[in-house]
Amino acid sequence: MSKIKESSSGILGASNNTNKESSQKSARSIALPMTYALIGVSCLNVWNSALGLNIKITYNIFQMAGLLTSSVLALFVNYPRVLLPTSLGVLTLLCAGFQIAHQTFSDSAFDTYCLAAFITIGLMAGIAQTIAFAIGTTKESNMSGYISAGIGMSGVLIFCINLILDYIVSDEKIYEINKSKLLCLFSISEIFLIITIVCCVLYIDLFPKNDNNKDSTDIEKAEEKEGRLPLIEIIKDGYKAILSIFLVNWLSLQLFPGIGHKKWQEKHGMTDNNVTIIVGMFQVFDFISRYPPNFTHIKIFKYFTFSLNTLLIGNFLRLLFIPWFVLNAVISSSFFTNIVQQCVCIAALAFTNGWFNTVPFIVFVKELKKVKHQKDIETISRIMVVSLFFGLFFGMLTTCLYDYFPIGILNN
């Protein structure tokens, strides 16, 4: 009898262990995508908070320089994974710095802090995103789409909070920046950053060389005997994804907000309320469009991912947004000045922006023909991040080209 009891207890024990393992795997399968989404949210929250508060808006170019610098360096320096939570920690300190400097520094000292902070934000956010995309794309279940989704989520989150704060906080300003809104927005950013740091420590293997078995979902490394490819061969194999990510970001930042809404407002005298609606439309539709490509296992969303060839065709078709945006600026007929039509225009640009930003990171690994080594895949991911930031940078630069064209007003 005792043997039977021991045997049955052994079976029950094994069953309990199996249940525990399955529940742990289930929890991890939820926590890991959430962690990568939080990385996307947290990296953008600080920048979006500064934009929402209109803090030294001209300093955005310095943040972009920081993003480009950190992403280009990643091509030559292999950032250790531990820099992921470290860079997020620095962003947390910068948020606290904004709160302290705004209330205690002189105008010139605050201006100096903002300049240094924007450069550092660019560097730290660039490092965090580069590392996260490099790790995420080499997962068996590609996690890079969740980072992209988090990036879109940040814009909507900060925009909505900003609108709510307009109705519930005082109008007191220091250096033309609302004191209460600055405290609230950066406090929210700090909370997200702290949660993200904890999740990174818990769910991402930050020291893979010290534990070969810890992260079983990583794609197996190629045999060491199988040498890595030269950089030119890596670029040849991944150029479609690299070009796609550049084109989508270049066009989006060239047209928004430089042409629509700024040129529209300048030419037609749009109300501030309509401008807020248009900005909100971009944030919302950019956010919405980043999710369907991550859920293609659901039948209704299966057409939201496609080949990189199709994506390139889609990016060239997006060039049709240029005449549409320009016509909205130059023609004063009731159709082109109608807020509904303008919202449709912005929503279409935003939807394709979020959608076409997410697809390349999800599908490029499957379309690689020569590249098989994990480190080579990470290299392509880093180059794609560089291409993304270069697209944003050149989009900002080429917006000013429209100032050299005689965009007048054509009446009915």
Curated annotation (Swiss-Prot):
Family under the similarity heading: Belongs to the SLC29A/ENT transporter (TC 2.A.57) family.
Transmembrane regions listed in the UniProt entry: 30-50, 57-77, 82-102, 115-135, 145-165, 182-202, 241-261, 272-294, 311-331, 344-364, 383-403
Residue stretches in coiled coil: none
Compartment list: Cell membrane
Top-level division of the source organism's lineage: Eukaryota
Protein name: Nucleoside transporter 1
Keywords tagged on the record: Cell membrane, Membrane, Transmembrane, Transmembrane helix, Transport
Function: Nucleoside and nucleobase transporter with a broad substrate specificity.
Record topology, Cytoplasmic segments: 1-29, 78-81, 136-144, 203-240, 295-310, 365-382
InterPro entries reported for this sequence: Eqnu_transpt (IPR002259), MFS_trans_sf (IPR036259)
Residue ranges, Extracellular side: 51-56, 103-114, 166-181, 262-271, 332-343, 404-412
Main location group: membrane
UniProt-recorded Gene Ontology molecular function terms: nucleoside transmembrane transporter activity
Lineage, opening ranks: Eukaryota, Sar, Alveolata, Apicomplexa, Aconoidasida
Region annotation Disordered: where it falls in the sequence: 1-21
Topology relative to the membrane: Multi-pass membrane protein
Ranges of Polar residues composition bias in the record: 7-21
Reactions performed catalytically: inosine(in) = inosine(out); adenosine(in) = adenosine(out); hypoxanthine(out) = hypoxanthine(in); guanosine(in) = guanosine(out)
Organism whose genome encodes this protein: Plasmodium berghei (strain Anka)
Alphabetized SUPFAM superfamilies for the sequence: MFS general substrate transporter
One GO CC term on file: plasma membrane
